[in-house]
UniProtKB/Swiss-Prot annotation:
Notes on the domains: The presence of a 'disulfide through disulfide knot' structurally defines this protein as a knottin.
InterPro entries recorded: Proteinase_amylase_inhib_sf
GO MF assignments: alpha-amylase inhibitor activity; endopeptidase inhibitor activity
Name this polypeptide is given: Alpha-amylase inhibitor AAI
Tissues expressing this chain: Endosperm.
Role summary: Alpha-amylase inhibitor. It is active against alpha-amylases from Tribolium castaneum and Prostephanus truncatus larvae.
Disulfide bonds: 1-18, 8-23, 17-31
Gene assigned in the entry: AAI
Keywords of this entry: Alpha-amylase inhibitor, Disulfide bond, Knottin
């Protein structure tokens, strides 16, 4: 999973943010 504040894009790479954080965008955001 991706740690808090790191870049994320679950629709692109399929990797979720670590609990309890969520990505601010499906394609290009950060975990918060």
């Amino acid at each position: 999973c991706i740690p808090k504040w790191n870049r994320c894009g679950p629709k692109m790479d399929g990797v979720p943010c670590c609990e309890p954080y969520t990505c601010t965008s499906d394609y290009y955001g950060n975990c918060s």
